[in-house]
Amino acid sequence: MLTKRLLTIYIMLLGLIAWFPGAAQAEEKQPAVPAVFLMKTIEGEDISIPNKGQKTILHFWTSWCPPCKKELPQFQSFYDAHPSDSVKLVTVNLVNSEQNQQVVEDFIKANKLTFPIVLDSKGELMKEYHIITIPTSFLLNEKGEIEKTKIGPMTAEQLKEWTEE
């Protein structure tokens, strides 16, 4: 008798979840078009994030993150193979999560990273894009809207897929 009652309650709960599909989603919604930030790359170049008018891969990372360290050479290869006029690659180091900026600069030099790197020293981009896990990547369309989100490391194949769509 108790088993039938529990089964009935369970089926009713599943029905409610199916009826209200949004209630079962725990992931946080991203803003359709994030606010525009004018930032400087580590090389001193002015950059607008999002970069409206051009597809952009926006990637958040730190130098102490093992998956980030593993995937950054793939981002470098991607950057070398894709001229900036097709898809813009912008990476964001969460420098407020690092020991200090010098550690980041040393890491960049040691790994020969030449793609655009923005230092998010105040955590503004981290807050705007709701970064809670690194690495995290976004594909932004020409309007600056978030088309895709990848939490975790990106593979060369995923980078290629994102640029061919």
From Swiss-Prot:
StoA and ykvU are cotranscribed under the control of sigma E. The gene is stoA. Thiol-disulfide oxidoreductase with a reductive function, involved in spore cortex synthesis. It could be involved either in breaking disulfide bonds in cortex components or in proteins that are important for cortex synthesis, or in thiol/disulfide bond interchange. Residues 27-165 form the Thioredoxin domain. This is Sporulation thiol-disulfide oxidoreductase A. One of its GO terms (molecular function) is antioxidant activity. The lineage of its organism: Bacteria, Bacillati, Bacillota, Bacilli, Bacillales. It is found in: Spore outer membrane. Belongs to the thioredoxin family. InterPro entries: AhpC/TSA, Thioredoxin-like_sf, Thioredoxin_CS, Thioredoxin_domain, Thioredoxin_ResA/DsbE_sf. Keywords: Disulfide bond, Membrane, Oxidoreductase, Redox-active center, Signal, Sporulation. Residues 1-26 form the signal peptide. It comes from Bacillus subtilis (strain 168). Disulfide bonds join C65-C68. One of its GO terms (biological process) is sporulation resulting in formation of a cellular spore. The keyword Membrane applies. Its main location: membrane. One of its GO terms (cellular component) is outer endospore membrane.
